[in-house]
């Protein structure tokens, strides 16, 4: 059972590796057009062969991934219930479990903060400051966090964390391909991403969407849901989160604001926080109905949401 879960994660990583190497091969093909040496045709043939081989490798991994669900569907459900969603401290066996657990315990707040970042510059600065986070343990934590968030019906937050999980996987894969320490080459990844280099962003967004689709698909399988079931769940109740649970999860300064119901103090606190973190807490407070000093009529409710959003920017 555990090996099936490991094979699924291996499929995710191998798919990213194949896409990245394919983009590198295509980049080489484009570069050859700028040179005019006697060996151009030979180099072009080798690069084209490499591109074809990588495309075939990616196709094979896609087939293996689909077979995981058809060969043993009931086992898949057991594996994801036990190994990904329900047990918060169950980590992949690619590294020493004790080492992974200790790493998470020491750095969980930083890992969560990185998972909430949305801009390339913010992620690069954060990793430059906390370069010890550039490792497999971080990638594993973010991947498993995505499955847990989707299981908790927190799809928007899952998609945010998925972006950062794929960022970390691409950095690690670039390091493996170039045989460098990932802490020494992560800036190169962000340079390519921010420059919008042709091919690389397409690969990134393709893999990101594929990963999010896999998370949703396997979560539906593990809970026995069907796509039709999820349509009815897209209309949440007026208060879809437990107010007590949300309140306990807030930073102390936000708890004070909620208790005082003072909009000016709240605005000052939010302006001093990381924008992504502030947005996360604001959405949860609204969904839990913790902000009550503005009457919630149908007209006022939309203006209240707009006021919260204005404070985030």
From Swiss-Prot:
Please provide, in alphabetical order, the Gene Ontology terms of the cellular component aspect for this entry: cytoplasm
One Gene Ontology MF term: heat shock protein binding
Q: Which GO terms describe its biological process?
A: protein folding; protein stabilization
Q: Where in the cell is it found?
A: Cytoplasm
Q: Which residues form the signal peptide?
A: none
The UniProt keyword set, sorted, is: Chaperone, Cytoplasm
Coiled-coil-forming residues are none
Record has Nucleotide-binding as a keyword: no
- UniProt keyword Transferase present: no
Provide the family line.
Belongs to the CDC37 family.
The UniProt subunit note reads as follows:
Forms complexes with Hsp70 and Hsp90.
Q: What is the documented function of this protein?
A: Co-chaperone that binds to numerous proteins and promotes their interaction with Hsp70 and Hsp90.
Name of the featured protein: Hsp90 co-chaperone Cdc37-like 1
The root-end lineage is:
Eukaryota, Metazoa, Chordata, Craniata, Vertebrata
Gene name per UniProt: cdc37l1
């Amino acid at each position: 059972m555990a090996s099936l879960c490991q094979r699924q994660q291996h499929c995710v990583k191998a798919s990213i590796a194949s896409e990245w190497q394919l983009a590198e091969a295509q980049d080489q093909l484009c570069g050859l057009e700028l040179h005019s040496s006697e060996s151009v045709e030979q180099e072009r043939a080798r690069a084209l062969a490499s591109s074809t081989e990588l495309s075939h490798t990616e196709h094979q991994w896609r087939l293996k991934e689909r077979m995981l669900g058809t060969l043993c569907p009931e086992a898949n459900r057991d594996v994801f219930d036990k190994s990904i969603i329900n047990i918060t401290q169950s980590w992949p066996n690619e590294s020493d479990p004790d080492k992974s657990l200790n790493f998470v315990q020491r750095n969980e707040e930083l890992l969560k903060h990185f998972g909430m970042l949305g801009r390339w510059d913010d992620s690069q600065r954060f990793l430059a400051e906390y370069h010890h986070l550039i490792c497999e343990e971080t990638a594993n934590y973010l991947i498993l966090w995505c499955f847990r968030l989707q299981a908790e019906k927190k799809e928007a937050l899952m998609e945010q964390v998925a972006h950062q999980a794929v960022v970390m996987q691409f950095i690690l894969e670039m390091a493996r391909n170039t045989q460098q320490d990932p802490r020494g080459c992560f800036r190169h990844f962000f340079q390519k991403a921010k420059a919008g280099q042709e091919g690389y962003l397409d690969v990134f967004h393709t893999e990101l969407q594929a990963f999010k689709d896999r998370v949703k698909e396997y979560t539906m399988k593990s809970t026995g849901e069907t796509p039709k079931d999820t349509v009815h769940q897209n209309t949440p109740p007026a208060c879809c989160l437990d107010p007590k649970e949300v309140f306990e999860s807030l930073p102390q300064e936000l708890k004070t604001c909620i208790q005082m119901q003072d909009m000016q103090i709240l605005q000052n606190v939010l302006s001093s926080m990381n924008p992504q973190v502030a947005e996360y807490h604001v959405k949860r407070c609204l969904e839990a109905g913790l902000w009550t000093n503005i009457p919630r009529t149908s007209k006022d409710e939309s203006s209240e949401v707009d006021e919260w959003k204005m404070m985030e920017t």
